Amino acid sequence: MFSSAQNLEQKIIPLEGDASLDKLILTAANKELVLLGEASHGTHEYYLWRDKISRRLIAEQDFNFIAVEGDFASLYHLNRYVKNMDGAGNSAREILLKLHRWPTWMWANEEVVALAEWLRSHNDKLPQDRKVGFYGMDVYDEWNSKKEVLDLLKVTDKAAYKYVEEQYNCFYPHKGDSWGYANAVDTSKKNCANATRNVVEYIRDNRENFSTLSDDTYFYLLQNSIVVDNAEEFYRESVASVGRVSWNSRVHHMHGTVNDLLNLYGEKSKGIVWAHNTHIGDAEYTSMRNTGEVNIGQLTREGLGNNNVLLIGFTSFEGNVMAGPSWGAPMKEMTIPPAVTNSIEHELNQIDQESFYLIFDEKDKDYENPKVMGNRAVGVVYNPTRDERQFEPTIVPMRYDALFFFKKTTALRVLKR
């Protein structure tokens, strides 16, 4: 039973090189989705080991894509690059340095450059229809997605362009200000929901009108329109409703994007997801359940079945992290203090091993009297003096299928501009 460091020590697999992952890769081999988490958005070790896992799943188990907690339109340039598609940039570094929306460090870092260049090299050996993709799945950067829809239609279908432009003119008074739009809607009760939905339905229902577009380009067009549509709802609900409504709106968008990618890659496709533990660890086994919040981990288990999904968390006892002191503030390297007592991090730190992972099984799950522990959760905004508030009450072996632990972690290596 999952109860103490002494019991847990019998289950650990030390991280001593790529071969340490053998058991995990075999466990993940036949899953439809493998979700890889992180306890922060700015930790080197989380990115490094997610990279190692992703490479092996792709090279050895034929996984088809990686979907990350990032913007769809801007990160699609990286997808073009790793697939060597028309319009691709000259290097992953060049593309990632063009990212502009805060927090840029989440993807504009050396760790992602290394993964992207490996993907490019791996894909160069494959036919075009088997190349592995890299996609953003988040709901943000909607004005860029709106521009991409219009720019693509302008050169492919003048009638469609005119129709979509008329629909999107609903946003014209707000000129790129989504919060301004949401506040205006809250006051006037007039919104653009019908307009954005009309665009999605027009593109989805008229595939024959876009016959000159490849499946990849059509997917790009449709998915950008979905971003605009779901972002409209997300911002509107953020102002008008309680927090769980907008949170769940964003979650359903990300989950929907992952499902769309599974459909894009066809029967027997398999995907990898990179996102915060808050998104990939099953919300049913955290305090999120009490507020009605869901997440991707929960929805994928419900949709695909527990046996077809692997949820892998990442966490640490202490270390350094890249984060911002407030939303939009310049990033800085911060110190994460030692984990609080009654946390899984405090428990795992008692084990005399610098880094390791555990794979949970039915013997670890106590359905009658589950043990609730804190689980570190550092966001892009972080205040180390309030670190004790950054722990999510969690039933660990039920929230995750596996958990990686590091005694001390270091900050992401951000690209220099």
Where are each of the predicted segments found?
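Structured catalytic-domain cores with a bias toward divalent-metal coordination
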Residues: 2-417
